[in-house]
């Protein structure tokens, strides 16, 4: 029996759980249930990520303390997770005494080991709010392309990265005030100290998906930098030891919350467990983190480095999921597809969504699409039309004609045994997180069971004199096949599994219990197990999501100081731009590129991520600020012109290796495309 600790990425205590969040939590819960069904000792913990400026400001806007803010949100999160059957053994908060102690311990051990540096940095300071501003609370004009309304770290139009102090016409998004530069001592974690260690760690077998390890190579090639782990007061979080008015950056104590949540679980519920058995350096137990692909950088670089520096064990593996789209597009409040967990639960059975997600998920880091029409069709066809239908077709005969008791003989031992044997490959698929493969195999078995019943036609046999035993045998085989399917689906559909277990009056419903065929076994009266998805309920859920947005928009808002208006600079007219010589122009290497792939960028309303064939051995990754004007599918297969010798730019979404040329006049943007006949890699001159 393996001993395993599983965690999920911590939801931020600043808002509700929505469909995009649930993809990763349902994936982890299914895996935990499957591993337990195979007989392993699995502990599953999580917590709210409860620190940071955003929470402090949200509490201020709501007129409550940060402590009250995070307590309220935590109860909402617990309610929503419970509603979807995501059953944590313990759900904590990073704002706990245990997390404070553990965070200080890891920091002090790293400080003692020489992994902490202190040096002054110059930041932008809001004179009205009397606080330093992080990049997300600063907007201004890009110093490179002069695009307005850009954040303090990178331009989403031209892709340039910069320091917030380089922004033109900067303004605080909190007060509208013009920030001033101010110096402050900050604390840094020396990540470069762990460069060689991390390069090996990220390539350890089973540690990371290969695609993620390949992506991290870009960071190693660019060179790791010291990580700023401090924030200045005012800030809601833990104060750094021996550093008054300096606080741990939220991404320091957030992953440490995995440890403190487990620690609190031991104290509250399982004192027989030992914390060190899971977290000491030489621990043989397993620790896995289920996370979204947007937070890989923190979990695959900073987190293992901090643990290594403090002499703790590192995670056995990171299981990474992609993003969720709805109907093929980014979730949208205006379209009603930005669906909160609470809204879904008011309209639909949560097990519908668990099944649909499972049918889509694999061990690959791929985005998943919740197509609402396909959702209705798949659930109704698979769960109601195939699986539940087997019990419905057979149980009525057992209940009405055979005193609720199955036949003492198995009429189809080879057929039933084939279902039992299939459990091995299904279990392997679950363990490998190949849920879609497991579902496909289970549904193939369901088809086989229905085919058997269709061929034997117990309803017709029941009308023939002297065929009672045959009816009894056929329906008993059908119930045994149904039981196997329900066991295999139990990690995905725990509520349905509990109902089936009660209906079949079984003490155990784990994978091992499937080996025993039910003979002369008494069952309960059959009750309907699952209703069909009503398309009207889906439509009502979408409408309610629109309604909740409208209600939010119309709700009274806290008064804010009017932002200072920044005058928009007109684009220079033809002939007014700075004159350059031919020696400057010929430095620019313009090449024809073919768009192989195009995708939206999570967290950006302006960027598209393009994979470009430039006639080189490997394709180029380029971020382009054209999302408002092009759909990804419009660009795939299109020839464009790019600047091929632009220095790589590290952005918060990844590294951009070039710039796609486009024309614009304020009313739109048009990507420049060569005539047909041009080939990827051709030089433009």
Curated annotation (Swiss-Prot):
Motif interval(s): 'KMSKS' region: 330-334
Known catalytic reactions: tRNA(Met) + L-methionine + ATP = L-methionyl-tRNA(Met) + AMP + diphosphate
GO cellular component: cytosol
UniProt cofactor note: Binds 1 zinc ion per subunit.
Coiled coil: none
One BP term from GO: methionyl-tRNA aminoacylation
Superkingdom of the source species: Bacteria
Required co-factors: Zn(2+)
InterPro entries for the chain: aa-tRNA-synth_I_CS, Anticodon_Met, Met-tRNA-synth_bsu_C, Met-tRNA_ligase_1, Met-tRNA_synth, Methionyl/Leucyl_tRNA_Synth, MetRS_core, MetRS_Zn
Documented EC number(s): 6.1.1.10
Top class in the EC scheme: ligase
Record: residues binding Zn(2+): 142, 145, 155, 158
Function, as annotated: Is required not only for elongation of protein synthesis but also for the initiation of all mRNA translation through initiator tRNA(fMet) aminoacylation.
Protein name: Methionine--tRNA ligase
Species, as recorded: Acinetobacter baylyi (strain ATCC 33305 / BD413 / ADP1)
